[in-house]
Regions:
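Glycine-/proline-rich flexible loop or hinge segments
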Residues: 52-64, 95-106, 129-133
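Conserved polymerase palm-domain catalytic core
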Residues: 79, 92-93, 149-251, 255-274, ...
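Non-catalytic, polymerase-adjacent accessory regions of viral genome-replication enzymes
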Residues: 1-19, 23-74, 398-430
Length: 430
């Protein structure tokens, strides 16, 4: 494939090439991922891994285990092996975390989603083709690794930083640009490439019960979308890695550092040029340059020297969510003549799940995302105080000093759990 002379990146104007089979292809010595979908031992390994990693609750595991035991995957796996595609995805709007905004996500039928999860699990064999500065959806790499490695790289150095967020990244990926990259990466598995080609070029979905035609990128919400999103910008990641730039990407969030403002501006201009080539847009509300004496924010963390806390943006989002949930519960309790204590208990239960123990094992709670990384608790204290205020508000209907008639012991009796206390408990366990 041709490379552009000025950037070293792929010429994105190319047509999708047909993968070429030949004696040098590793595919002849490997079993296609598509073929593995029909093997019970593959499914059993997949279920065991997800259970070990806490990505199933026991009810979900029992259902999935029964599905595998009766070989419920075989009809769909055989159809895929014969070259058939999946059904149409369903498009829906869901609330963005901590804001009143909506985002578009897609899903397939339950058995199709489970097959896509298995494919995503098996795709980790291509993990070594990504640059070390790409952290999202990598086996053995976490968001905390990005923060720790950045802090180590810039320790003691006055560095400028540029942070950006790609607008609607997953759903904006240009499939005509992605497919040649995918063809190259999956050159050893033509069956898998053709499965993705069919999946990604079917520009139909179901919205509100109606079939609509639209371009939907790699379809946010589907299990294979994170892998495809890593593939799409892997050459950009590699470009900055080869130049020795302190750089990290976690899906649509990117940050890079430079020793002076002019160099940072060059990196920024180059990144904007790359994103234009890939038909992507920067979210202007989430774009920021940090001077050397400022704390930088990335992936919900605020970092300054050796100090790591939750970011200002994270606190603002969570306060918005707490406030909206409290007002909603107050309206509900008034309308249905519910005792204030029940509304207070409802708010506590909701945020206990969000902070510590989600019903969805795929959801990253605060205790899993923030606690292993932060070493400051000011942000947690601020959220604790704000949540307590809103719990008391549900008890009195007012935001004033009368709220303190509901003392802390009453909150604890309703099973309120302090973020700060839980953080120190988790630190002691470690």
């Amino acid at each position: 494939m041709s490379l552009t002379r000025d950037t070293g990146l792929r010429d994105t104007g190319q047509k999708v090439p047909e993968p070429v089979e030949g004696p040098s292809r590793v595919s002849q010595s490997r079993v296609s991922i598509i073929s593995q979908l029909t093997l019970q031992e593959t499914w059993e390994e997949f279920l065991a891994y997800r259970l070990m990693k806490g990505r199933f609750n026991w009810h979900e595991f029992d259902e999935a285990d029964a599905f595998v035991e009766r070989k419920g995957y075989l009809p769909l796996a055989n159809k895929i092996a014969e070259g058939e595609g999946l059904g149409l995805p369903t498009k829906k709007l869901v609330n963005k975390m901590g804001s009143g905004k909506k985002r578009v996500v897609y899903s397939f039928a339950p058995d199709e989603m489970l097959v896509l999860k298995l494919i995503a699990f098996l795709l980790y064999k291509y993990d070594d083709q990504f640059a070390p500065n790409c952290y999202a959806f990598r086996r053995g790499l976490k968001a905390s690794d990005a923060v720790f490695k950045i802090n180590k790289a810039i320790h003691g150095k006055p560095m400028w930083a540029y942070k950006l967020d790609i607008h609607d990244y997953f759903n904006s990926i240009d499939i005509d640009i992605l497919l040649p990259m995918l063809a190259e990466m999956l050159a050893d598995d033509l069956l898998l490439y053709h499965f993705f080609e069919k999946l990604l070029t079917t520009n139909l979905s179901i919205s509100n019960g109606q079939i609509i035609e639209e371009k939907h990128g790699v379809m946010a919400g589907t299990p294979t979308a994170p892998f495809l999103a890593d593939v799409y910008l892997k050459e950009v990641d590699r470009y900055y890695y080869n130049k020795g730039v302190v750089y990290a990407r976690y899906s649509d969030d990117i940050i890079m550092f430079a020793p002076d403002y002019d160099t940072l501006q060059q990196y920024k201009d180059q990144m904007c040029h790359f994103l234009a080539q890939y038909h992507l847009e920067v979210n202007p509300d989430k774009e920021k340059i940090y001077s050397p004496d400022e704390a930088y924010e990335f992936l919900g963390f605020k970092c300054h020297g050796n100090d790591i806390d939750i970011s200002e943006a994270t606190k603002k989002k969570m306060k918005g969510k707490i406030s909206r949930k409290a007002r909603s519960l107050l309206r509900w309790s008034h309308k249905n003549h519910i005792e204030p204590e029940k509304a207070m208990k409802g708010l506590i239960n909701y945020f206990n799940r969000k902070f510590f123990e989600s019903d969805d094992p795929e959801t990253l709670t605060w205790s899993r995302w923030f606690f292993p990384v932060i070493n400051r608790t000011e942000g947690l204290k601020e959220i604790d105080h704000y949540l307590q205020q809103n719990i008391r508000f549900l008890g009195t209907g007012k935001h004033n000093k009368t709220n303190y008639r509901v003392d802390y012991e009453q909150l604890k009796a309703l099973e309120y759990r302090s973020l700060v206390n839980e953080y120190y408990k988790s630190s002691t366990k470690e």
